[in-house]
C-alpha cells in the first residue's frame, strides 16, 4: 500500500490570537469545541492535525473547508479524523483507505503528523470481476428477481428483518419472508416492503424465485431439518437459480450426513453458496478451530471442491473459494481488508441478504453467463462491499457504535461508489 505524509508545526500562542479574533467557529465544529473544553492547547493540536491532513492530500487547504476535517478522540484519548463534503471527495479521489494522525505538545509548540494510507491496486482476482452494473432504466420490479428468505425462529425476528433489508438494499426487486407466525407483526412494521408468506406453504410458490436464502436465526429443530432436506431433494426448489445457505442451515448440515449428501447431489447441478464463519466451518469440516486456523486455505479449497459449492469463509480477512473447472485455473479470492465494526450480532444476516440481492442484480445484467460463475462473482463483490460499507459506517457512527440495522444503508452506498468508479475507468 502507498502512503503520503503531512506534518504541521504550530505555536500555541497563534491559536490564542485566533481565539481573540473570534475565528474559532470558522475552524472547529461544535463537537470539536465541546471536546476541547476550552483548552487552547487542545484546539491548537486539532488545528495542526487539520493542516497536516491537507498536506498529506497534497493540496493544502484548497477546495474544502477546515470544518470538513473533524478531529475527535476515542475513549482512550487517541485522535482520529472524520471527513465531510469536499474533503471526503479529495480523500476518495486519492483512493484513500485510512488516515492515521498523531499529536505532540512541547508546551509552546504542537506537532501533528497525518499519514494517508492509499488502497492497493486491484489484484489479479479483482481485475477479472464483472463490473457492478447500473440499474436498467427500462426495468421493473420483476427485472431484478425474487428472493425467498427462510429466517427467524420465535424471538429472532431481527434475523429475518436484517436479511430482507440487506436484499432490498442490494437491489432485489421483491423479497418474500418465510418465518414463524409470532414474528410477522413485528416484521410487517419493520419492513413493510417484504411480502409475508406461510412457512408451511412452500410448494410451487418457490418455483419462480431467483434466490433461496435459508438459515439466518432459523433454528435447528426437526421441522427446519425436514424443510432443508425437502428443498435439496425436490425439483420445485431447483427452479430457483441460486441457493444461499447461512447460519443454522449450515449447522443442520454439519449434524446430518443425509443433508450433506443431499447438498452434494444438489450442488452438482445448481449453484450453491455457503457463508460460514470460522466456528460454523469447523463444524462442517469436523475439525478443531486450531486446525482450521492453521490450514484455512487448504481446508476451504478442499470443501468447495468436494461439495461443488461457492464457499465464503468469513473472518477478519474473508476468503472465497469455488470449484475450478479443468483448465480454467483456480477460483479463489482473498479480501485482506477488514472492518472490526462488523463483529456484532446481525451483521452476518445482513451480509447473507445483501449477497442474495446482489445475485439478482448480476443475474439481470449477466444472465447469459453460467450461473455458477455469477455465484462466484456475486460472492466476491459482496465480500468487498461488506468491508467498504462497514468503513463508511464507522466514519459516521463510530467503530464501536455501528448497528446491524444501519449496515444495509452503508453497504448500498459502497456499492454505488463502486459502480461510479467502474464508469470512470
Segments predicted by a language model, with ranges:
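Core catalytic alpha/beta fold that binds nucleotide/phospho-ligands
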Residues: 1-123
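Substrate-binding N-lobe of the ribokinase-like
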Residues: 140-198
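Short, well-structured alpha-helical segments that form the helix of a local strand-helix-strand
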Residues: 296-305, 367-390, 404-412
Amino acid at each position: 500500500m502507498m502512503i503520503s505524509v503531512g506534518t504541521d508545526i504550530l505555536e500555541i500562542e497563534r491559536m490564542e490570537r485566533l481565539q481573540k479574533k473570534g475565528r474559532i467557529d470558522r475552524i472547529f465544529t461544535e463537537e470539536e469545541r465541546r471536546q476541547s473544553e476550552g483548552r487552547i492547547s487542545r484546539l491548537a493540536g486539532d488545528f495542526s492535525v487539520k493542516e497536516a491532513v491537507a498536506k498529506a492530500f497534497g493540496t493544502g487547504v484548497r477546495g474544502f473547508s477546515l470544518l470538513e476535517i473533524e478531529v475527535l478522540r476515542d475513549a482512550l484519548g487517541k485522535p482520529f479524523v472524520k471527513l465531510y463534503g469536499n474533503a471526503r471527495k479529495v480523500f476518495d479521489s486519492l483512493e484513500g483507505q485510512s488516515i492515521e494522525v498523531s499529536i505532540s505538545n512541547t508546551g509552546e509548540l504542537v506537532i501533528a503528523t497525518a499519514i494517508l494510507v492509499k488502497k492497493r491496486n486491484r489484484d489479479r482476482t479483482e481485475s477479472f470481476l464483472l463490473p457492478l452494473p447500473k440499474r436498467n432504466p427500462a426495468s421493473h420490479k420483476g427485472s431484478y428477481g425474487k428472493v425467498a428468505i427462510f429466517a427467524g425462529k420465535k424471538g429472532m425476528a431481527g434475523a429475518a428483518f436484517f436479511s430482507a433489508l440487506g436484499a432490498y438494499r442490494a437491489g432485489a426487486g421483491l423479497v418474500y419472508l418465510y418465518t414463524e407466525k409470532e414474528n410477522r407483526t413485528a416484521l410487517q412494521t419493520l419492513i413493510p416492503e417484504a411480502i409475508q408468506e406461510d412457512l408451511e406453504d412452500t410448494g410451487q410458490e418457490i418455483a419462480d424465485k431467483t434466490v433461496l436464502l435459508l438459515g439466518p436465526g432459523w433454528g435447528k429443530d426437526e421441522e427446519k431439518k425436514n424443510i432443508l432436506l425437502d428443498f435439496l431433494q425436490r425439483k420445485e426448489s431447483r427452479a430457483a437459480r441460486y441457493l444461499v445457505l447461512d447460519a443454522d442451515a449450515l449447522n443442520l448440515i454439519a449434524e446430518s450426513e443425509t443433508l450433506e449428501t443431499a447438498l452434494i447431489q444438489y450442488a452438482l447441478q445448481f449453484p450453491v453458496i455457503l457463508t460460514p464463519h470460522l466456528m460454523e466451518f469447523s463444524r462442517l469440516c469436523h475439525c478443531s478451530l486450531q486446525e482450521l486456523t492453521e490450514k484455512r486455505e487448504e481446508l476451504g479449497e478442499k470443501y468447495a471442491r468436494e461439495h461443488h459449492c461457492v464457499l465464503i469463509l468469513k473472518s477478519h480477512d474473508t476468503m472465497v473459494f469455488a470449484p475450478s473447472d479443468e483448465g480454467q485455473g483456480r477460483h479463489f479470492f482473498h479480501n485482506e481488508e477488514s472492518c472490526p465494526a462488523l463483529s456484532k450480532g446481525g451483521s452476518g444476516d445482513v451480509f447473507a441478504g445483501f449477497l442474495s440481492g446482489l445475485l439478482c442484480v448480476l443475474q439481470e445484467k449477466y444472465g447469459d453467463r453460467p450461473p455458477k460463475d455469477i455465484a462466484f462473482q456475486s460472492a466476491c463483490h459482496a465480500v468487498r462491499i461488506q468491508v467498504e460499507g462497514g468503513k463508511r459506517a464507522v466514519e459516521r457512527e463510530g467503530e464501536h457504535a455501528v448497528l446491524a440495522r444501519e449496515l444495509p444503508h452503508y453497504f448500498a452506498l459502497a456499492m454505488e461508489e463502486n459502480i461510479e468508479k467502474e464508469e470512470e475507468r
